[in-house]
Amino acid sequence: MLDIYFKHRKLTLCGKEEIPVIADDRFLMHPAPDYNFSQIPYMMESSIYLRHLILEIPDEMTEEELLQKLLSGVKVLKAAGGLVQDEEGKHLMIYRNGVWDLPKGKQEEGEDISVTALREVQEESGVEATLGEFLTDTWHTYWLDGALIVKKTSWYRMFAPKDAPSKPQTEEGIEKCGWVTDEDLDYRLANTYPSVIDVFESAKKN
């Protein structure tokens, strides 16, 4: 199963055995293998009714094959970030554009994706973290210079000393960053992106 977020709307790719319970805000689509999948991202962007489109993977295709067809008409960028915990279990979060987020950024040419994750955490927060295990990939869209972009972000668990000093990268629009206790986490997650919630959920499973 794979989710792509269009702001607070969601496109889910799944097999027959993974189809979630259908509700009023969910639409299930059973496409033929020759369907024009490349139009779906633009349909998600333009529709005022679609909140959650569930796209069943045709029997003749793999998830990867469907994803390639789906994204054939958009530019895909790769990025990476970290879910950083200190020795007391507090999480590192940043505040940018009025939303709480996790440090992340675009992969540089020739750079290993795990190196991207560590570099971006250090640049955006000032925290020197230690790399842990891979957690998950998230996908989300945005518009840039009139073009629809899909960003794939690879997330890693990371570790840092207790209350490690942090400094927001203000030139990237980050207003503040710091360590969040479990007691304050729900408050922050009430004002974050759906993909960030997915990262925390993935960490609970690993």
Predicted segments — roles?
Residues Q85-E123:
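Conserved Nudix-box catalytic region and its N-terminal flanking loop in Nudix hydrolases
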Residues L2-I4, T12-E17, D25-H30, V99, ...:
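Nudix hydrolase/Nudix homology domain
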Residues V84-E87, M158-A160:
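Active-site beta-strand termini and strand-to-loop segments that position acidic
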Residues Q107-S195:
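Unchanged
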Residues Y35-G81:
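Acidic, metal-coordinating catalytic segment for phosphate/diphosphate chemistry
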Residues G81, K90, K176:
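Conserved beta-strand and immediately adjacent loop positions that scaffold enzyme active sites
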Residues M1, A79, K151-W155:
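Short hydrophobic/aromatic beta-strand or adjacent loop that forms the aromatic wall/cage
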